[in-house]
C-alpha cells in the first residue's frame, strides 16, 4: 500500500511539472506571436470569424439596447 501511494504521488508530481512547463512554453509562444505583425493580423481575423459563427449559432449573448 505504501509503494502504491508513493507511485501515485510521484506520478502526480511529474504530471504537475509537465503541465507547468507546457504552460510556460505556450505563454512564450503567445508572446512571440504578438510581436510578429503578420501573426497579429491572423489572430484578429480568427477572432472575427469566431464571433460571426458564435452569433450565427446563438452562442453569444445578445446586447440589450
Curated annotation (Swiss-Prot):
Q: Does the keyword Hydrolase apply?
A: no
Main subcellular localisation: secreted
Q: Which GO terms describe its biological process?
A: defense response to Gram-negative bacterium; defense response to Gram-positive bacterium
Q: Which segments show compositional bias classed as Acidic residues?
A: 26-43
Q: Pro-region residues?
A: 23-47
Q: Where is the signal peptide?
A: 1-22
Q: Which Pfam families match?
A: FSAP_sig_propep
**GO annotations of cellular component type:** extracellular region
Start-end of Basic residues biased regions: 50-65
Q: What are the subcellular locations of this protein?
A: Secreted
Supply the alphabetized keyword list: Amphibian defense peptide, Antibiotic, Antimicrobial, Secreted, Signal
Report residue spans for region: Disordered. 25-65
Q: Summarize tissue expression.
A: Expressed by the skin glands.
**Family, per the entry?**
Belongs to the frog skin active peptide (FSAP) family. Brevinin subfamily.
State what this protein does: Antimicrobial peptide.
* Name of the featured protein: Dybowskin-2CDYb
Amino acid at each position: 500500500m505504501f509503494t502504491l501511494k508513493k507511485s501515485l504521488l510521484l506520478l502526480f508530481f511529474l504530471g504537475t511539472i509537465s503541465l507547468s512547463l507546457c504552460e510556460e512554453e505556450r505563454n512564450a509562444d503567445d508572446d512571440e506571436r504578438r510581436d510578429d505583425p503578420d501573426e497579429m493580423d491572423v489572430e484578429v481575423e480568427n477572432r472575427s470569424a469566431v464571433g460571426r459563427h458564435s452569433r450565427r449559432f446563438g452562442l453569444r449573448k445578445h446586447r440589450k439596447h
